[in-house]
Amino acid sequence: MSKYIFVTGGVLSSLGKGITSASIATLLQHSGFKVSMVKIDPYINVDPGTMSPFEHGEVFVTEDGAETDLDIGNYERFLNTNLGKKNNFTTGQIYLSVIEKERRGDYLGKTVQIIPHITDEIKRRIKEVAKDVDIVVVELGGTVGDIEGLPFLEAVRQLKHEVGKTNAMFVHVTLIPYIKAAGELKTKPTQHSVQELRRIGITPHMLVCRTEKPLPKALKEKLADSCDIERDAVIEAVDAPTVYQVPLNFLNQDILVPIAKQLDLGDLHPDMTEWNFIVKKIISPQKSVKIAFVGKYLQLKESYKSLIEALIHSGAHLDMKVDIEWIDSEDLEKADDEKLDEIFNEVSGILVAGGFGERGVEGKLKAIKYARENKIPYLGICLGMQLAVIEFARNVLGLEYANSQEFDPDTPEPVVYLIDEFIDASGQKQLRTHKSPLGGTMRLGGYECFVKKGTKLYDAYKSDKVIERHRHRYEVNGAYEDALKEKGMIVSGKSVEGLVEAVELKDHPWFVAVQFHPEFTNKLKSPNKVIMSFVENAYKCQRSC
């Protein structure tokens, strides 16, 4: 039978439940177990796809086309695996599924209630993930005591009894605040949080304590005694120089001992040699390179979580620190040539990230033009590719009114236009118009890209076919391909249907733009190749360009 580890959070949010969950899963995976993960989000949205980046942070896209919580990205990067739609679900999805069943008559006229119908649907989804693995780690979003989370806590409480006490474990992530004025660490918030869990019928088997200061032995013993857990199951989680250090910190505290004891796993000895080697490269690299990151959601940098991690991973594998120079695209709109020189003077590469809407677009166009004219290595992603084509069409082809239909539906030169027909990740034909609903209507998930030999994109991938993930409604208009090629911008990647997937400049040290999101396939142990090529060429350029 599969084993279950449920990770809850107390006191307040953003304590690092996702990293804690991923770290535990990683240690178990490196101990030889087949591990998967689930993230439960208690909000009523069906998925985060239509939520503002400022509200939710990044929307992570899986191989099978799900728009998910950014923690799914953390799980994939830690476990070096691909997850999917079944690994993330929300209150909205649960209620929608139950209501659809009720409308079909699946409940045979019964009154539909939280218990058993909602809780049964939650348990069914968790069990579905557990079917093919040894251990599933389930992170429950939110904080204990939130009204939205009660059905989920009840469901996992029931599940524990169904699978038996040696097949389920509860890990509670909590805060031990340090009061500077008193010079003391305080345990009372954690004690109250555990009491709240107990009222629901759950007693945690382990505490993971976020803290600014190391926890004295006496304080750990106090927590263990007051919360009724074993003393070796109080784990401290101090801030680390990188999140990838956290599994190693946990391992140094023998976190697997109480886990193995509770789940009857035997002696565990994870091999973290390769992991430790990469972490050292992240913390103490020999070289450095500065990259300008041009975006429009910089107030919440978690909007670009996967891309930031991809740069870090590429740097680690090149023994290099990637210093990110954050540049708000709206600030560039007001900048003259002298100001642009000042902004980009010390950077060795320019990255223009994806986004939606017209805000900040003119600033991104200025950054792209600067990279093109000054021979600075450039990577454009999603909108960053579309704008690279618009900039080239306006300033090199002389098409003054070249634009995207996203910003000007009536543009006379639609070099970027709405994808009105495509085959989705499940093989189904999809039709779209400007009036189609926003939720779940984009080109989503992994698609094949055929790479043209003799291009920089081919040099990066060393393959003529790759699978990368997409999240977009608009696409470069293939009708302009010949005109672009004649002036030096070539299409270096296309989809099965012939959609433009990548463009690059022939007479430039390294100018590549892609419609897909390479950051979504990036992993700690296997960085995305086009992002790593960008970082590598930016470093080369700072020394020779």
From Swiss-Prot:
Gene it is expressed from: pyrG
Glutamine amidotransferase type-1 domain ranges (all copies): 290-544
A Pfam entry, by short name: GATase
Job of this protein: Catalyzes the ATP-dependent amination of UTP to CTP with either L-glutamine or ammonia as the source of nitrogen. Regulates intracellular CTP levels through interactions with the four ribonucleotide triphosphates.
Alphabetic keyword roster: ATP-binding, Glutamine amidotransferase, Ligase, Magnesium, Metal-binding, Nucleotide-binding, Pyrimidine biosynthesis
Active site: 382 (nucleophile), 517, 519
Protein name, as recorded: CTP synthase
Organism, as annotated: Nautilia profundicola (strain ATCC BAA-1463 / DSM 18972 / AmH)
Annotated catalysed reactions: UTP + L-glutamine + ATP + H2O = CTP + L-glutamate + ADP + phosphate + 2 H(+); L-glutamine + H2O = L-glutamate + NH4(+); UTP + NH4(+) + ATP = CTP + ADP + phosphate + 2 H(+)
Family recorded in the similarity comment: Belongs to the CTP synthase family.
Binding-site positions, ATP: 14-19, 71
PROSITE patterns the UniProt entry points to: GATASE_TYPE_1
InterPro entries: Class_I_gatase-like, CTP_synthase, CTP_synthase_N, GATASE, GATase1_CTP_Synthase, P-loop_NTPase
Keyword Hydrolase: no
GO biological process terms held by the UniProt record: 'de novo' CTP biosynthetic process; pyrimidine nucleobase biosynthetic process
Entry-linked Gene3D superfamilies: 3.40.50.880, P-loop containing nucleotide triphosphate hydrolases (3.40.50.300)
